Amino acid sequence: MAKLQITLTRSVIGRPETQRKTVEALGLKKTNSSVVVEDNPAIRGQINKVRHLLTVEEK
């Protein structure tokens, strides 16, 4: 399976609680933090929910 590098590029300050929890579930804590995850439908759904806060690259 492909891997995705996800970077939190915008702050979660002032965002709804659901978006904050989604960012936390992806393993991101601070702005400019990154994680590498497996590409699967569950992760894609989370990314789509907060795509305005993230940068996603395929690895």
Curated annotation (Swiss-Prot):
Keyword tRNA-binding included in the entry's annotation: no
GO biological process: translation
One Gene Ontology cellular component annotation held by this UniProt entry: cytosolic large ribosomal subunit
GO molecular function list: structural constituent of ribosome
Database matches in InterPro entries: Ribo_uL30_ferredoxin-like_sf, Ribosomal_uL30_bac-type, Ribosomal_uL30_ferredoxin-like
Keyword terms of this UniProt record: Ribonucleoprotein, Ribosomal protein
SUPFAM superfamilies assigned to the protein according to its UniProt record, in alphabetical order: Ribosomal protein L30p/L7e
CDD domains the record matches: Ribosomal_L30
Presence of the UniProt keyword Ribonucleoprotein in the record: yes
Domain of life where this protein originates: Bacteria
PANTHER family linked: LARGE RIBOSOMAL SUBUNIT PROTEIN UL30M, MITOCHONDRIAL RIBOSOMAL PROTEIN L30
NCBIfam families listed in its UniProt record: rpmD_bact
Quaternary state and interactors: Part of the 50S ribosomal subunit.
Family, as annotated: Belongs to the universal ribosomal protein uL30 family.
Protein name: Large ribosomal subunit protein uL30
Source organism of the structure: Staphylococcus haemolyticus (strain JCSC1435)
Taxonomic lineage: Bacteria, Bacillati, Bacillota, Bacilli, Bacillales
